[in-house]
Regions:
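Conserved N-terminal beta1-alpha1 strand-loop-helix module at the mouth
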Residues: 1-125, 129-204
Length: 204
């Protein structure tokens, strides 16, 4: 069954409501984004996530020390890294927490992914332009070749998630803007989330 992460949660009401829909993971963004929240706010929201749901903090730490501080203060299950942090720094962080490394999908994506393979637990394939679909053919090739779980992101929504899973065959899918109230970044549409989870989970 496909692993599903609902990302970009920004408020307490949505944490509680989304948790009831039972995704596999909930993500909080500290990196530059319309859904960015402060460390203190993330700390409070993370406490609301039930133990049955994995928590993910999305960040761009400048070095391992900064990442370790985030881990210490927030205690997430995963740290999702969205910058080109040096491999030596990622290796240090990997001794403290499970890491998801985001990779922008382009013709060089697999070569880049291979450099991190020994030091992370999973890869997230994202679009260069946030909230848009990328080349799923490249993603499918990466998912097939990677020795680690691959999570597909970038422009997913309830309408295209089944096709995306069918074509790419990822370990998991990640959605943020595709399940929001139109024009309100960070505010989730629960009907869209319900449909997204149901459709992703029904795919075999």
């Amino acid at each position: 069954m496909v692993w599903v992460k609902i990302c970009g949660i920004t408020n307490s009401i949505d944490v509680e409501a989304v948790a009831k829909l039972r995704p596999d993971a909930i993500g909080f963004i500290l990196a530059d984004s319309p859904r960015k929240i402060t460390i203190e706010k993330a700390r409070g929201l993370l406490r609301q996530v039930p133990s049955s749901i994995e928590s993910v903090v999305v960040a761009t730490p400048a070095n391992a020390r900064e990442g370790e501080e985030l881990i210490s203060r927030l205690q997430p299950d995963y740290l999702q890294i969205h910058n080109d942090l040096a491999i030596a720094e990622i290796k240090k962080l990997g001794e403290k927490i499970a890491i998801i490394k985001a990779i922008q999908v382009n013709s060089n994506a697999f070569e880049k992914l291979k450099r991190y393979e020994k030091y992370v637990q999973a890869f997230l394939l994202d679009s260069v332009k946030k909230g848009t679909v990328h080349n799923w053919d490249i993603s499918a090739e990466i998912a097939r070749k990677s020795s680690l779980p691959v999570i597909l992101a970038g422009g997913l929504n309830p309408e295209n998630v089944v096709e995306a899973i069918s074509r790419v065959k990822p370990f998991g899918v990640d959605v943020a803007s595709g399940v929001e109230i139109e024009g309100r970044a960070g505010v989730k549409n629960l009907d869209k989330i319900r449909a997204f989870i149901e459709r992703a989970k029904k795919y075999v």
